[in-house]
Amino acid sequence: MKKNLLGFTLASLLFTTGSAVAAEYKIDKEGQHAFVNFRIQHLSYSWLYGTFKDFDGTFTFDEKNPSADKVNVTINTNSVDTNHAERDKHLRSAEFLNVAKFPQATFTSTSVKKEGDELDITGNLTLNGVTKPVTLEAKLMGQGDDPWGGKRAGFEAEGKIKLKDFNITTDLGPASQEVELIISVEGVQQK
């Protein structure tokens, strides 16, 4: 009787633990369902928008246990695009992103907390050779089956970073000290 009870208990624990594992997703950049955008004020008159065209990443998602979720993203900083070739060249220089020395930026989450219907994703952003904690406010846009037999989940996130925190000290004026991040990703569940 004790062996049967022990076996049942172990089997139950294994089954329960296995079903609580967060699903892993790969960001769908091939289908153009993911964007890492930013905006910064230009002389207090308007917004300058830009994007990073080359990035990759994964995330795990467990709606019932968000604290177990993880996010990992790598961005090719040379892929910055603001729709102006000369400005993009300047952004790639040592005055800003210094892509020759730091060709990648990375974000690795350290915690995920559910706040109402949003997720606060805190992690380490490494940019221009500096690593600082950053919190993104994310919202689940939807999840479910796709037409090709797979599963997908989509999120939008926003956050802000201060340029000086990442050793970008070029004087752009008082209105241009922070960059707003606007991120939209759709992930394909991995099997």
UniProtKB/Swiss-Prot annotation:
Task: Report the InterPro entries cross-referenced here.
Answer: Lipid/polyisoprenoid-bd_YceI, TTHA0802/YceI-like_sf, UPF0312/YceI
User: Which SUPFAM superfamilies does this UniProt record tie to the protein?
Assistant: YceI-like (SSF101874)
Q: Record's Gene Ontology CC terms? A: periplasmic space
Signal peptide per UniProt: 1-22
Q: Which SMART domains match?
A: YceI (SM00867)
Keyword list, A-Z = Periplasm, Signal
Q: Name one Pfam family in it.
A: YceI
Please state the protein's primary subcellular location.
periplasm
Write out the annotated subcellular location.
Periplasm
Family statement: Belongs to the UPF0312 family. Type 1 subfamily.
Its recorded name reads: Protein YceI
- Encoding gene per record: yceI
